[in-house]
Swiss-Prot record:
Highest taxon listed in the record's lineage: Bacteria
Residues of the UVR domain: 203-238
Species name: Desulforapulum autotrophicum (strain ATCC 43914 / DSM 3382 / VKM B-1955 / HRM2)
Known role: The UvrABC repair system catalyzes the recognition and processing of DNA lesions. UvrC both incises the 5' and 3' sides of the lesion. The N-terminal half is responsible for the 3' incision and the C-terminal half is responsible for the 5' incision.
Gene that specifies this protein: uvrC
Record protein name field: UvrABC system protein C
Length: 606
């Protein structure tokens, strides 16, 4: 700690607020909140000994701090969460889960809504379910819902333009809403059943359906009664696959944390109507924090973006801001939420179940981490690197017969793909068929940027030529001694070569990788991933360019109208044969827009 820090904390206000601790480079390394800023800072700086390990390590690096005063501790808690997400401080608990999870959506404002998969929650009147842990779990849920309830599966444009029942209706997998085979009222009732099912209220739904089945049977509507019976059986079959963990039919989430050094895993179990319906594991970098602090950060982060907050949340240990966090949950849910630390009984057994799952997941993660460490250490050795190759970047070019040239950058951190760091590049200046010039441009753009840290190892896809070009770029930017660069060339089977070859600057022969094949395979995975990423991006650009048509230049014809026209007529030729009146009758079209289309098609034909 510096003398200025000791002086400044003594003049800190005795108000609620947030403090941001900084190291000698001005980087924010810790963000915290306090009811009384002066007292909290005094707990750090008024004494030099008696701190826990995390605080001791932190204070050795603090040379400055900033303060933000808030009106209440509640506001400070919210601001703390916002700043942690923004700055990702080294010594805060960071949830390593930035991806958006898939959700299910039903837009009840539509007369015949479908079940959709989305990754963003819109500000609308639709009903959302999730988030789900994977695309596979979403598909499984959709498959169950479609099998039981038979909602429409076609897109809105197809639905609006269909003139006869689809194949799904013909095989009894759809209610046939597109061709008026089901009334709006009946479809709405089915949608209501789907919502109950997805909310975990299947027992309530079954009871109601049994009553309806009996009513239909009493009225001698035996066919309808049989349909309801089949629906009940399908729902019951689904429920049989779920594990009953509680008899009180309460919705609750169960959260526990396993920790080992700077790595942790939080497991959350989802209990709906007494059934264990799913779970999810979240890896954490602990920042040397303990379980209570990790659980505190997790509960705040998770439920801040969760679509559903149950009435009861069981946690393994009491968290630091227990009362404040519970108030935040109540505020978001709009009704009571209990944040409970069970001591005994069925609820404690649920917490222990979550803890066992967290420990197993952590053991798996640590095993993967240890294997990655061994591989990266071997790579460091064979490449003669002075630093551990924690961050590796690999670049690749792609084009189609010299057109639409692009490049990709993929990043592996600690031996694993870090997809949030991937970058795509559209070639701006280099000639389309000049691979060296394209790579020179991309490396120059990447290494001139300060948005991302420099890599420990940079790999280019290619042999000595590409490597020489990369070295030239590094020299031009004054980076030739900042990190290692290597080229990966494919084996030449005609020469009897068995393995791909890694080349280093200033060496005529490739690196000997026979004793470190795992290291070679890691570099190959990088190269293959860069190739995949570049090819995918190049294909998308090519498809987008190929997808342009005469309609793109027609005034008043946007994306939706173009989609309706192309879906209806399947091509420009058939569209040109339609009359203005036929064009104007399509959904979303007007007479003026139809006349514009007709004129444009006539000019295009000429």
């Amino acid at each position: 700690m510096t003398p200025s820090v000791l002086e400044r904390y003594q003049s800190a206000p005795q108000n609620p607020g947030v403090y941001l601790m900084k190291d000698k480079r001005g980087t924010i390394i810790y963000v915290g909140k306090a009811l009384n800023l002066k007292k909290r800072l005094a707990s750090y700086f008024a004494r030099e000994t008696g701190h826990d390990m995390k605080t001791g390590v932190l204070l050795k690096k603090v040379v400055d701090f900033d303060l933000i005063v808030t009106a209440t501790e509640h506001e400070a808690l919210i601001l703390e969460s916002t700043l942690i997400k923004k700055h990702s401080p080294r010594y805060n608990v960071i949830l390593k889960d930035g991806k958006s999870y898939p959700c299910l959506r039903i837009d009840t404002s539509k007369p015949f809504p479908a079940l959709e998969v989305v990754r963003k929650i819109g500000d609308d009147n639709a009903v959302y379910f999730g988030p789900y842990s994977s695309v596979q779990s979403v598909r499984s849920t959709i498959k169950q819902v479609n099998k039981i309830f038979k909602l429409r599966k076609c897109r809105d444009v197809q639905f609006a333009n269909r003139t006869r029942p689809c194949l799904n209706y013909q095989i009894n997998a759809c209610l046939g809403a597109c061709c008026n085979r089901v009334s709006r009222q009946e479809y709405a009732r089915v949608v209501g059943d789907v919502i109950l099912f997805l909310k975990g209220r299947a027992p309530d739904l079954i009871n109601r359906l049994k009553f309806e089945m009996q009513t239909e049977a009493d009225l001698e509507h035996f066919e309808r009664a049989a349909q309801i019976r089949d629906t009940i059986l399908a729902i019951q079959t689904t429920l049989e696959r779920q594990v009953v963990v509680s008899t009180d039919r309460t919705d609750r989430d169960v959260i526990a944390c396993a920790i080992n050094g700077e790595k942790a895993v939080v497991t959350i179990l989802f209990v709906r109507s007494g059934n264990l319906v799913g779970s999810r594991n979240y890896p954490f970098d602990t920042g040397l924090s303990g379980v209570p602090e990790i659980l505190d950060a997790f509960v705040r982060h998770y439920y801040e973006r969760s679509l559903f907050i149950p009435g009861q949340i069981l946690i393994a240990e009491k968290i630091e801001n227990h009362g404040l966090v519970q108030d935040l949950l109540i505020e978001k849910r709009g009704k009571r939420v209990s944040l409970v630390v069970p001591e005994r009984g069925d609820k404690r057994r649920l917490v222990e179940m979550a803890l066992v799952n967290a420990q197993k997941e952590l053991e798996k993660n640590l095993s993967i981490q240890n294997e990655a460490w061994e591989t990266l250490t071997a790579l460091q050795t064979i490449l003669g690197m002075s630093v551990y190759p924690r961050r590796i970047e690999c670049f690749d070019n792609s084009n189609m017969a010299g057109t639409d040239p692009v490049s990709s950058m993929v990043v592996f951190v600690d031996g694993l793909a870090c997809k949030s760091e991937y970058r795509k590049f559209i070639i701006r200046d280099a000639k389309e068929n000049d691979d060296y010039a394209c790579m020179t441009e991309v490396l120059t753009r990447r290494l001139s940027s300060t948005e991302a840290p420099l890599p420990d190892l940079l790999v280019v896809d290619g042999g000595k030529g590409q490597l020489s070009m990369a070295v030239a770029v590094l020299k031009s930017l004054g980076l030739e001694n900042r990190f290692q660069v290597a080229g990966l060339a494919k084996k030449d089977a005609k020469l009897g070569e068995v393995y791909d070859k890694i080349y280093l600057p200033g060496r005529a022969n490739p690196v000997n990788t026979r004793g470190a094949l795992k290291a070679l395979y890691l570099v190959q995975r990088l190269r293959d991933e860069a190739h995949r990423f570049a090819i995918t991006f190049q294909r998308k650009r090519r498809s987008k360019r190929a997808g342009t048509s005469v309609l793109d230049a027609v005034p008043g014809i946007g994306k939706k109208r173009k989609q309706v026209l192309m879906t209806t007529y399947k091509g420009i030729s058939r569209m040109g044969q339609a009359t203005v009146e036929e064009l104007a009758s399509l959904p979303g079209m007007t007479l003026a827009a139809a006349q514009q289309v007709k004129s444009a098609l006539a000019l295009d034909k000429d």
